[in-house]
């Protein structure tokens, strides 16, 4: 570490991270506010609610979380005071749960620590993702592979690494900034593995579908390699002793938390069997359940078997693949119920199982660039969920919202209506 009179300077790889004395003071003020909120009676009660929710099979109240990251550009800039780029990134990370807790009043917790995550990298087949931006929310992936038979030689070994030194430097920086105010904690979030997404990043979806039909052997070989590479990457972290178990308020994909009484929190070093895994396969929504069962699920099922618990799904419908595939996963504990899912079917299947009915409502209910809601539509949506998922363990994760009319009050009202609708 290099110290200066006015600045805290830490070198992170080839990047010099400089936090000015002014920005450091702002971050310390924010850290004090975070600790105040973390120890508030409401946050402490909410933490106990999540613990009870993690233990329950059903019957506990539905938990509701709003994922702010996709629309934070409409709300956070006016709250931010730091000037330096690095300081603003830290400030943004701290503000997210604070805004959820104080402005939205959903079930987001304010942590009594600043989390530092392991710096790691995984490049499937050694092919860096190439994207063409559209100038708006959309983008286009530029493919490497068009025909598996002709382009198979482009598939190299996957590249993966862990930057232990970079992680340590970030931890030291955070401790320097927050010394005496906010503890800094190394955190292992859930492990993620979505092979079909990786394939679509290097091979457009139509070509992937054609390969599934016309070149099954090469498609199987591609899935086999990717599964083996991911497992080697995860095993490397396990063998180096870099993992800690998570069964508490650590991040689980899809806007959820890791709360459960089936895993032990805080084991370090941990094994893969102590951890949550997240997987999805949105890209195969256009193939039949039988094709999914033959070409995709065997590799997913194998990966899932190495972990403690599993959360599955994003925007794809889960009901077509439930009976023949997902229901066979003994450690599945959360499944996404997207807007394209048959809610009643999945409610019937999940009732009494302890598998969380992780409802992802339509983004358009909240995500229109207007300051008000269609309140009747919001209520109807959540009443339908309450009816369909009666007897299930319900969790709401409102995601993929890109605009809210710049109104935190609108989001707060959405949470109020969701709670009212879920009451039946």
What are these model-predicted stretches?
Residues 121-148:
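A contiguous, low-structure linker/loop signature
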Residues 139-168:
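A gly/proline- and charged-residue-enriched helix-loop-helix capping module
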Residues 55-127:
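An N-terminal, globular interaction/scaffold subdomain
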Residues 2-68, 83, 108-110, 159-424:
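Active-site loop segments of alpha/beta catalytic cores
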